[in-house]
């Protein structure tokens, strides 16, 4: 059954319920009014952007979870996560032994050397006692339940093929480190964590989708140390100074090959800067919704190429903060040669986007990773279900 058919069924079901249970308006006249939840269900079922259209609106999603791996777009396209492995169900929210985690815990599953598609038995809040080190070929899939990870963040270091989907990560602290399980072997000594919700270092084929990220000690997502082929999509970033860092230092020349996509995300509720902040690499920032910022929205140094396409930039009211961009680390003349381009972007409330450089000639790899941009006027709709969402077995998401 396709998306349209599922939506029609849901629509007529909700309409029938409304007919049987009419409510009254403030004026006292009998009136059929859809609830907020009904409106959100219809909106979600519609699956508005290219990633969600790949899998949402299908009632059999629970029995075909691994089809999600075919839906990655941008530079993480082809990331399969744990598609070729077993489905592993997390049954416990405990994290009481980080060196030798018990079977049934998220830490045990994440450390395995084999591919796994990790799901959750029920709603749970996982209070991590140390950073969670995720091994290669894993999908962490929170669909069907509400999964929150707090206190500690996720670390993806020198790994490949990771999908993180529909997880709420918040209130992440710097943790002291120690002996931590990171693979099938003995635990290894880890230094203190940085306090990011998701830290990606030296890794490739990483897809972060439909996550809600907020309140961390440092940043929300850091991608550094030669990481590449990364897509951050359909996420909601809130209540944090620093959102996304793509390249950590102007001396890290290994990031010259970084390819990253930032697509269909919502930045709102007191996010100050780094949406993203880029160094060296090649970045497509496409169809995101920027609902004000503090210092700036998108920044960079070390001559990154940043292609902004079809975004909606709603500037803050402060007249000195209207600039979308921040160029740092060099003189004005040099930075104005960097290829920072704008196409189809919507600038609102006096937002200013000062382009520089020229339209680059794309390599075949760069061309293959580009997501077709819709006009900025569509960004609000395309990001309307960003972040985690409710999804029930037997019904379309």
Swiss-Prot record:
Q: How is it modified after translation?
A: The N-terminus is blocked.
PANTHER family per the UniProt record, alphabetical: PECTATE LYASE, PECTATE LYASE 18-RELATED
Q: Which cofactor does it need?
A: Ca(2+)
Q: Mind listing the UniProt keywords for this protein, alphabetically?
A: Allergen, Calcium, Disulfide bond, Glycoprotein, Lyase, Metal-binding, Signal
Reaction(s) catalyzed by this protein? Eliminative cleavage of (1->4)-alpha-D-galacturonan to give oligosaccharides with 4-deoxy-alpha-D-galact-4-enuronosyl groups at their non-reducing ends
Cofactor stoichiometry and binding remark: Binds 1 Ca(2+) ion.
Q: In which pathway does it act?
A: Glycan metabolism; pectin degradation; 2-dehydro-3-deoxy-D-gluconate from pectin: step 2/5
Q: Which residues bind Ca(2+)?
A: 194, 218, 222
Q: How does it assemble?
A: Monomer.
Q: Which residues are glycosylated?
A: 37
| InterPro entries on file | AmbAllergen, Pec_lyase, Pectin_lyas_fold, Pectin_lyase_fold/virulence, PEL
The identity of this protein, by name, is Pectate lyase 2
Q: What does this protein do?
A: Has pectate lyase activity.
């Amino acid at each position: 059954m396709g998306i349209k058919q599922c939506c029609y069924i849901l629509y007529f079901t909700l309409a029938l319920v409304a007919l049987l249970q009419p409510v009254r308006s403030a004026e006292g006249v009998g009136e059929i009014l859809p609830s907020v939840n009904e409106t959100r269900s219809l909106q979600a079922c519609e699956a508005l952007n290219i990633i969600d259209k790949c899998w949402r609106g299908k009632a059999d999603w629970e029995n075909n979870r691994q089809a999600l791996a075919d839906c990655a777009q941008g530079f993480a396209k082809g990331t399969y996560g744990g598609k070729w492995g077993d489905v592993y169900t997390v049954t416990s929210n405990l994290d009481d032994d980080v060196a030798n985690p018990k079977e049934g815990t998220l830490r045990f599953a994440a450390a395995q050397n084999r591919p796994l598609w990790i799901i959750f038995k029920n709603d749970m809040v996982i209070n991590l006692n140390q950073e969670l080190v995720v091994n290669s070929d894993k999908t962490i899939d929170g669909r069907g339940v509400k999964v929150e990870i707090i206190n500690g963040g996720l670390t993806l270091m020198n790994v490949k093929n990771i999908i993180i989907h529909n997880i709420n990560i918040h209130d992440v602290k710097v943790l002291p480190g120690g002996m931590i399980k990171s693979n099938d072997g003995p635990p290894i000594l880890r230094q203190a964590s940085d306090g990011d919700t998701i830290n990606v270092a030296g890794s490739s084929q990483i897809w972060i989708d439909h996550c809600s990220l907020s309140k961390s000690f440092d940043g929300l997502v850091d991608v550094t140390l030669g990481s590449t082929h990364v897509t951050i999509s359909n996420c909601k970033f809130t209540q944090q100074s620093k959102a996304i860092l793509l390249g950590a230092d102007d001396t890290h020349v290994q990031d010259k090959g970084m390819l990253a996509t930032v697509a269909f995300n919502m930045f709102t509720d007191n996010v100050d800067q780094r949406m993203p902040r880029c160094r060296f690499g090649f970045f497509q920032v496409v169809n995101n919704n920027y609902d004000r910022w503090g210092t700036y929205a998108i920044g960079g140094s070390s001559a990154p190429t940043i292609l902004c396409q079809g975004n909606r930039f709603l500037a803050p009211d402060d007249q000195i903060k209207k600039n979308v961009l921040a160029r740092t680390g060099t003189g004005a003349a040099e930075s104005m040669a960097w290829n920072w381009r704008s196409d189809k972007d919507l600038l609102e409330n006096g937002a200013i986007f000062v382009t520089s450089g020229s339209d680059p000639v794309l390599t075949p790899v760069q061309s293959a990773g580009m997501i077709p941009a819709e006009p900025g006027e569509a960004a609000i709709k395309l990001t309307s279900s960003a972040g985690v969402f409710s999804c029930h077995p037997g019904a379309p998401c």
